[in-house]
From Swiss-Prot:
Protein's UniProt name: Cytidylate kinase
Database matches in Pfam families: Cytidylate_kin2
One record GO biological process: pyrimidine nucleotide metabolic process
Organism encoding this protein: Treponema pallidum (strain Nichols)
Keywords tagged on the record: ATP-binding, Cytoplasm, Kinase, Nucleotide-binding, Transferase
Catalytic activity: CMP + ATP = CDP + ADP; dCMP + ATP = dCDP + ADP
Gene this protein is translated from: cmk
Keyword Glycosyltransferase: no
CC terms in the record's Gene Ontology section: cytoplasm
Binding site for ATP: G7, A8, S9, G10, C11, G12, N13, T14, T15
EC number(s) recorded for this UniProt protein: 2.7.4.25
Family statement drawn from the similarity comment of this UniProt entry: Belongs to the cytidylate kinase family. Type 2 subfamily.
An example Gene Ontology molecular-function term: CMP kinase activity
Amino acid sequence: MRIAVSGASGCGNTTVSALLAERLGLPLVNYTFRNIARELGISLSEVLERARTDNHFDKAVDARQLCLAMRSSCVVGSRLAIWLVKDAALKVYLLASLKERVKRVLQREGGDVQDVERFTSMRDAEDMSRYKKLYRIDNTNYSFADLVLNTEGCDQETVVSIIIEMLRARGIAW
């Protein structure tokens, strides 16, 4: 059984995926550009800059994510998880306003409000463009997701509890 969780930067995707995996006793698969940045010893901004002109970064992240996900039951958390993990037992998409996402990124990483807002908006636009170009995926169309949750005003534990209730309601065992 695989559970796929997606959402834009700052929606709670990484945190919710990790908590969900922990609560269900499943491995977490969350291999992202941040992992590549750490592995290469460069900043996330530099990886994003390189990804603008080099499809290798997206393809490497997505191939690694899928390879890890196919090994066993797991929670997969990534921007494209609900699109790429086609056999997921549950596909969850997390939402939050740009203002809320910026607030969360600031809490997590610090910085200037205007810089973070500009960076987040730019990243959203670039992600959308790359996903359309590489995979013909419109990441603003998540209508096929089994569960769409607005995480604004919700703590992560509440979001995880809602997802677990959905699993139970569907009779999905873990």
